[in-house]
Amino acid sequence: TQMGFLELLYMSDEESVLKSEVANKLNLTKTSITRATAQLEEMGLIQQMKSGTEIAIKRNYSRKEYYENAKGYLINPVQKVITIMRYEATFESFSAGETALSQESELNPPRIEERAIYKGEEVVDQLEIVDARSEDPDDCLKIQLWKYNPSYFAREGCVNPVSLACTFKGNEDERIEMSIEKLLEEL
């Protein structure tokens, strides 16, 4: 559902899209996209319209209102965080966590760079997990394993702002909260 939400979030206002196109783009089954759009419609966030034999969907709100109305339902996409040696990172990954936030705000970057990949990537099983406390932080990378593929909505090598904000759910750090507010002002 969150992937469907994000796909519509990043479209322009008033734009509609065929449900089948969203399913293809995001690699979702017909069942998954049907369930997702039904949930979004139930929440009053989108409408579904018949378009010939297809069904088109569009947001009921401007981008900002759409996000505001949904943010209570959005989940943290991070399943698990692992630490690996930097030289192992030969796969495509996206700037995430405090690393991504520091690129968009005044926040200082974390001691160990944070990146995101989809938990279902084949490479995940081959990664050797290390204990960051016994390694030089400069040689380490923190890898967030995401529940959905961050590549679908990534921009300029960085995870998308709304998903990034979701990764900090429950974080009490004021500097982070302020940086996220600033980041989301541009929605």
Model-found features: residue ranges?
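Long, low-complexity, charge-rich intrinsically disordered regions
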Residues: K71-L187
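Short acidic, hydrophobic short linear motifs in intrinsically disordered regions
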Residues: D13-L26, T37
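Short, structured loop/turn "capping" segments at alpha-beta junctions
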Residues: E15-V17, S32-I33, Q47
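Short amphipathic alpha-helical interface segments
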Residues: Q2-E15
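Short amphipathic alpha-helical interaction segments
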Residues: N27-E42
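Minor-groove-contacting beta-hairpin "wing" of winged helix-turn-helix DNA-binding domains
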Residues: T53-Y61
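A short, conserved structural fragment
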Residues: E41-G52
